[in-house]
Amino acid sequence: MTLIDQLPPNADPDALFEAFSSWAEDQGITLYPAQEEALMEVVTGANVILSTPTGSGKSLVAAGAHFTALAQDKVTFYTAPIKALVSEKFFDLCKLFGTENVGMLTGDASVNSDAPVICCTAEVLASIALRDGKYADIGQVVMDEFHFYAEPDRGWAWQIPILELPQAQFILMSATLGDMKRFEEDLTRRTGRPTSMVRSATRPVPLSYEYVTTPITDTITELLETRQAPVYIVHFTQAQAVERAQSLMSINMCTREEKDKIAELIGNFRFTTKFGQNLSRYVRHGIGVHHAGMLPKYRRLVEKLAQAGLLKVICGTDTLGVGVNVPIRTVLFTALTKYDGTRVRTLRAREFHQIAGRAGRAGFDTAGYVVAQAPEHVIENEKALAKAGDDPKKRRKVVRKKAPEGFVAWSDTTFEKLIAADPEALTSRFKVTNIMLLSVIARPGDAFKAMRHLLEDNHEPRKAQLRHIRRAIAIYRSLLDGGVVEKLDTPDAEGRTIRLTVDLQQDFALNQPLSTFALASFDLLDPESPSYALDMVSVVESTLDDPRQILAAQQNKERGMAVGAMKADGVEYEERMERLQEITYPKPLEELLLHAYDVYSKSHPWVRDHPVSPKSIIRDMYERAMTFTEFTSYYELARTEGIVLRYLASAFKALDHTIPDDLKSEDLQDLIEWLGELVRQVDSSLLDEWEQLANPEVETAEQAQEKADQVKPVTANARAFRVLVRNAMFRRVELAALDHVNVLGELDGDSGWDADAWGEAMDGYWDEYDDLGTGPDARGPKLLQIEEDPAHGLWRVRQTFADPSGDHGWGISAEVDLAASDEEGRAVLRVTSVGELGQL
């Protein structure tokens, strides 16, 4: 029986409240006073702003709101900041209200979009609000994690629905809202409904606070001994979190029995990367690591172990994600300051409470603990004073350590102020974009009046409003000049005085706004060119968001190599530094793509909100014939391998979906298959997540996660595996061409081909030739022969060298071990010979 079966025959507020309360009681749930108050306001039609601590049951209030909307025959929207949380809520609401009554919109997928209960991201709702405004069929909006309103890049999406949906009842929820008086007044003015602020500082699990001056290892040891674990240690960089995990390996965290349970739960889980191998050691010791740069499967494993109560300590960052279910008894702050991208500053009250509020597990703990470490130099000074004892002479002789230069200090007073402080008032992040104007112009009615309302009746101060008005005028003029908008002499049947000359829905995609530009740019490429497949990749890569960490690593590598070359050429220091400023990361087809974008944006102005950005990540990895591990190692990205994987997965999805089948050459199809298999073998959860979002009726989120941990054999995808083999062989050709025999020795030492063996073999080649080709022809299928011998569990492979004379007499022979390849998720091969082909 679903919650929808409990709907009363009429929408009387008392009947609604009684029906929902009875259902909750049947589930063994006793409503907290704040929940009761919020639900009473919801059923009477009031807007509600709910600010209660983490773990106080805001989700139950949201369910009650949806229940009320359904009883009143209204469409109700639930929004969350991330797609994973939207997906999770979708399945939760399906269980409550039945799959036929719940839909989902994420930008990537649309499921049952006509359902009366819709789960979506804030951006999706904002897009609907801009396009349809007061005409949208939306009777209620439940906005979870409303503090995202103040996010610099995304906050606009939390404001637009409030401005544009006066017909809706709003329920705004967060644990860290601060002063919301202006929102109360604003919502009442716009919607004509009373607005109730429901606030409670009472936590289901009370918190106690402590400021300590002991070394952090001593602090952690004491927390473990006093049964205050699991402890979440807050760091302000991912590197610090990993370093802390390593430093804690000297503390005995778990009993033998607990370690056995950890090993049992880990089972056959594959730690496929360099960081994964370190993580395996940490978690088996009872130490977790959790941050956004990790592979999703590693984060999920840490969460699984934590939920089973097997981890004593989790080393993470201050950005413990929304919707991440990591049970914590104690939160330990290593500092009360952070670098925010511009400067080091004291934590804001909202930041502090957002993470401190994670302490204490409802249903498990009777108390939660929040501990803050003093600065290291203060701790060392306290230690020295303690050693001196009570002797005044000894204490005077203690040389106090000074804070590092530029250090932003904190103290117990800082800690006390943060504890007492309410979260800061939410700051408006309104912004004007091309798509905003286009969406409003596409609506029925007077677009000028609608835009004036948006620009002058938002939450911005007047000075900012004037800036937005100037930008809107500039965008409108560009739309007129580009012929995208035309004025009408008389209003049309729907009251428009201006109209679009293009079909916005066909040309604009919320999740891939530059996909139509990519489609137009494919026509600029020559299908007969040897670089066609890679050029197609470069077009698609230019439309993807920039992964800053990867691009910075590529730039650092390019500059490092350039410095070495300039030193060898005797270039003076000042000139070297001047030249270095011009060196950046690789940008294939930059001139072509920037010109094409300039032309395209004149007739498709909405793309101007998303500048094209040439880059080479997929192309770079493919041209270097690198595996995932080799790529992250080469660019020193092991600590942010999750970001690398997310980019690769996004690129695979874009390549697969954006490029029409008739434009996919054999080489390009091979490359796409290779990329998809590479992502799946490293961590299939991102691709599985997309598939599950598109087909939620096939499996639940939990089933999709379980599937992600059960990796398919890499040899099962024969086409992709051939490319992996080809890349593995060609990687050796490239290294041989660069005379990197030491790297070759590291690759093949186990099969008898150490650096000396490779050097000796290649000496013969260099005696005959002065170059070894590594261009498109050199890696083509004509120079690679594969003899499949599944009966013996292997493939025999021969890679021919592209010598400058075209003799094709030299090459590499190897055997590919199929079973080992499946075990490791990559092409595992053993070099058998390097030399003239007659000798192989």
Spans of features found by a protein language model:
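Non-catalytic terminal extensions of ATP-dependent helicases
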Residues: G288, Q307-A308, K393-K394, V398-R798
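Helicase-associated low-complexity/disordered flanking segments
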Residues: M1-M40, T44-V48, R256-R284
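Compact beta-sheet-dominated globular domain cores
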Residues: A802-L840
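Conserved segment of the helicase C-terminal RecA-like domain
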Residues: T330-F333, T337-Y339, R345-A386
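Conserved C-terminal RecA-like helicase domain
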Residues: T79, S87, C94-G103, Q238-V313, ...
